[in-house]
Amino acid sequence: MINDILEPGLRVVFCGINPGKSSAHTGFHFAHPGNRFWKVIHLAGFTDRQLKPEEERHLLDTRCGITKLVERPTVQANEVDVKELHEGGRNLIKKIEDFQPDALAVLGKKAYEQAFSQRGVKWGKQKLKIGKTEIWVLPNPSGLNRASLDKLVEAYRELDDALVARGR
C-alpha cells in the first residue's frame, strides 16, 4: 500500500487515479520512470527542484500533498472500473473535508467524471467545490498520456498561478 502525503494547511493535493505497478513495488507515488509528475510539478513552480519519488515527503515542505482515487495497483489506469472510481470519489471527499487544502487537483478527466458523476468536464478549475477546496482537473502525467510536456506544465502552472494570485 502506498501512503497518502497529507496534512492540514496544504496549498494543493494532487490526486492520481491509482498506483501503477512500479509505484506499488517501490511504495512511492508516480515512481515509474516514464511518469512525468515530478518533472511537471517542478517546471510548473510547485517545487524549487525536481524531486525523486523517494523524496515524496518533501512535498509537504512546499505545502503540496498526494493521494489517489483507488488503492488497487494496475498496469494501466483504464483497468480500474467505474464502481471503484465512485467509491474512491466518496473516500476522497472525506479526506478533503478532513484536510481542507486550498485546491484538489484530480489528474485525469475521465477519472474525475466517473468518480464525481460529472459529464462534459473541461480542463482546469471546476464549478464543484468540496467545502472551501477548489477542484481542478489536470491532465494525467503518465507516460501513456500523449500530452506534451509543455502542455502538462502549462496546465499545472495555471493552477499554481491561481493559488499565488489568491495569496496561497
Swiss-Prot record:
<dbReference type="GO" id="GO:0008263">
    <property type="term" value="F:pyrimidine-specific mismatch base pair DNA N-glycosylase activity"/>
</dbReference>
<dbReference type="GO" id="GO:0003677">
    <property type="term" value="F:DNA binding"/>
</dbReference>
<comment type="function">
    <text>Excises ethenocytosine and uracil, which can arise by alkylation or deamination of cytosine, respectively, from the corresponding mispairs with guanine in ds-DNA. It is capable of hydrolyzing the carbon-nitrogen bond between the sugar-phosphate backbone of the DNA and the mispaired base. The complementary strand guanine functions in substrate recognition. Required for DNA damage lesion repair in stationary-phase cells.</text>
</comment>
<dbReference type="InterPro" id="IPR015637">
    <property type="entry name" value="MUG/TDG"/>
</dbReference>
<dbReference type="GO" id="GO:0005737">
    <property type="term" value="C:cytoplasm"/>
</dbReference>
<dbReference type="InterPro" id="IPR036895">
    <property type="entry name" value="Uracil-DNA_glycosylase-like_sf"/>
</dbReference>
<keyword id="KW-0963">Cytoplasm</keyword>
<keyword id="KW-0228">DNA excision</keyword>
<keyword id="KW-0378">Hydrolase</keyword>
<keyword id="KW-0238">DNA-binding</keyword>
<keyword id="KW-0234">DNA repair</keyword>
<comment type="similarity">
    <text>Belongs to the uracil-DNA glycosylase (UDG) superfamily. TDG/mug family.</text>
</comment>
<dbReference type="InterPro" id="IPR023502">
    <property type="entry name" value="MUG_bact"/>
</dbReference>
<dbReference type="Pfam" id="PF03167">
    <property type="entry name" value="UDG"/>
</dbReference>
<comment type="subunit">
    <text>Binds DNA as a monomer.</text>
</comment>
<dbReference type="GO" id="GO:0006285">
    <property type="term" value="P:base-excision repair, AP site formation"/>
</dbReference>
<protein>
    <recommendedName>
        <fullName>G/U mismatch-specific DNA glycosylase</fullName>
        <ecNumber>3.2.2.28</ecNumber>
    </recommendedName>
</protein>
<keyword id="KW-0227">DNA damage</keyword>
<dbReference type="GO" id="GO:0004844">
    <property type="term" value="F:uracil DNA N-glycosylase activity"/>
</dbReference>
<dbReference type="InterPro" id="IPR005122">
    <property type="entry name" value="Uracil-DNA_glycosylase-like"/>
</dbReference>
